Amino acid sequence: MTNSSTFCPVYRDLEPFTYFFYLVFLIGIIGSCFATWAFIQKTTNHRCVSIYLINLLTADFLLTLALPVKIIVDLGVAPWKLRIFHCQVTACLIYINMYLSIIFLAFVSIDRCLQLIHSCKIYRIQEPGFAKMISAVVWLMVLLIMVPNMVIPIKDIKEKSNVGCMEFKKEFGRNWHLLTNFICVAIFLNFSVIILISNFLAIRQLYRNRDNTNYPSVKSALLHILLVTASYIICFVPYHAVRIPYTLSQTEVISDCSTRIALFKAKEATLLLAVSNLCFDPILYYHLSKAFRLKVTETFASPKKSKPLEERLRSENDV
């Protein structure tokens, strides 16, 4: 870092964000724990979409581990070693969750599209064995990209306030961080195209079936697609609109102090939207997994209402 950047108070005034991060954490941990319980209780036959949702849930638990540390660090009450740990480990867990979520939402969209367009066929990509294999490949790929940021040696710098994670990185660590950012943006762009195309094809197929006698199912399927698309756009698009300019400000390509501060605040605000997928995901589980819907029905509906609801849900296809 240059002297000019040393005196630029980029990493201050984070306390207002921490309250929202805490709210996301609280809602997310409750929803994720309930979802885990529901899947364990009810899921016996795993279809592809259930496998992808379980992987999404696993990624969400990584985020719940990381958020408390981020909150403590951003409040300015963390000891120095915890701040270093956050930069090396928990910050990376947040991004591991983000890109796993993006990829698995794309696979959910593909599976949904194939179910609607070719309902009488089962392709290799729709087999549970393939879903498990591709899930393992996705985890391995994301970890290979992210884990080096955790293990690359860092600089031993003097304890001080207003320090950013980039200041701990040596030259190789900075270069890897920059490469990681561009790879992640490429992942986002490619899987965004997949999600948009899959959902467009699915909506077109539903539009063709709008006069079908089974209209309630068509309407329900349309709702599922719109939920996935809306949660994806709200959570991930704003962050990636800011990510490249913010990365350039970290590497001194953008050196104006006021611009760097504005980009950092924009990054934190859009990161808050990105981690809010922790709150949206239980809603997706409810609409996309019959096992989850059944457990919610059993738990929260009155005994008189729960039985007919359960019978109706069991008669539906697991989506």
Curated annotation (Swiss-Prot):
Effect of a null allele: Deficient mice exhibit stronger antitumor immunity.
Transmembrane domains' residue ranges: 22-42, 49-69, 90-110, 133-153, 182-202, 225-245, 269-289
Protein's cellular compartments: Cell membrane
InterPro entries per UniProt: GPCR_Rhodpsn, GPCR_Rhodpsn_7TM, GPR171
Disulphide-bonded residues: none
Topological domain spans for side Extracellular: 1-21, 70-89, 154-181, 246-268
Intervals, Cytoplasmic compartment: 43-48, 111-132, 203-224, 290-319
First-listed, main subcellular location of the protein, grouped into a coarse class: membrane
Entry protein name: G-protein coupled receptor 171
Organism per entry: Mus musculus
